[in-house]
Design a protein with these regions (language model features):
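Divalent-metal-activated hydrolytic enzyme cores
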Residues: 1-36, 68-89, 104-226
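N-terminal short beta-loop-beta anion/metal-coordinating cradle
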Residues: 19-60
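Short beta-strand segments
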Residues: 41-43, 65, 95-99, 180-185
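Glycine/charged-rich beta-loop-alpha catalytic/anionic-binding loops adjacent to active sites
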Residues: 58-69
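Short acidic/polar active-site loop segments enriched in Thr and Asp
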Residues: 92
């Protein structure tokens, strides 16, 4: 574990040396271009590096992270990432991943966070109000916050479907294009896939009726740099 700044550099040298020893062309191949099939939208929490939990390598995940894994429809940073991932990289899967024991979720629930972070997590406060009865029905606070983490992920997926970028991709029927909702349990290291209310969203007109539950599994990608 890196405890000092110099440890980061030393660890990098060791890691790069080991990689090159095992695969001499690893970095030259990696430098040519990227072609990730996945866009990962996750929390900024230092315990949330998805490549570690999924045993993936550099070049496999296009990543956007922020506090409490928000999909903000007014965040130019996020929307630029989404546009590039969908329209240029042609990712087939978008994964919104939250986690249990999330500090942002807990702070928003208790209403104690202020400043810019308070503004950023206001949408979670709205979830607390909208699902007040469901949350209060759970006596254990930790389990209540776990449910809020799950509700937050599902809400962010719904926000994704509201974007013109995703709507355009759905209308063009991009082969294999799917959006997934995950929650990571840090206490076990395991990922939980959440069920999405697809039929309800179709009834609301959020998702075209022509969109299938499993739109295909075409794994072909062109490589692009950024």
């Amino acid at each position: 574990m890196a405890k000092q700044y110099k440890d980061l550099i030393n660890n990098n040298r060791l890691w790069a040396s080991e990689k090159k020893e095992k695969e001499p062309n690893y970095f030259s191949r990696l430098s040519l271009a990227q072609r990730p099939p996945f866009l990962y939208i996750g929390c900024s929490d230092s315990r949330m590096p998805l490549d570690t939990y999924t045993n993936t390598e550099p070049g496999e995940l296009f990543v956007h992270r922020n506090i409490a894994n928000q999909v903000s429809l007014t965040d130019i940073n996020f929307l630029s990432v989404l546009e590039y991932a969908v329209n240029v990289l042609k990712v087939q899967h978008i994964i919104v991943c939250g986690h249990y024991h999330c500090g942002g979720i807990a702070a928003a629930y208790h209403g104690k966070v202020k400043g810019l972070v308070g503004n950023w997590t206001n949408p979670i406060r709205d979830l607390v109000l909208n699902y007040n009865s469901e949350l209060n029905a759970i006596e254990d606070l930790d389990k209540r916050l776990d449910l809020l983490s799950e509700l937050n992920v599902i809400q962010q997926v719904e926000n994704l479907y509201k974007t013109n970028i995703v709507q355009h991709a759905l209308q063009k029927c991009h082969a294999g294009f799917q959006i997934h909702a995950w929650v990571l349990d840090i206490s076990t290291g395991l990922i939980k896939e959440l069920e999405l209310p697809m039929e309800a969203w179709k009834n609301k007109g959020l998702i075209p009726e022509t969109v299938e539950e499993d739109p295909g599994k075409n794994e072909n990608h062109e490589a692009h740099g950024v």
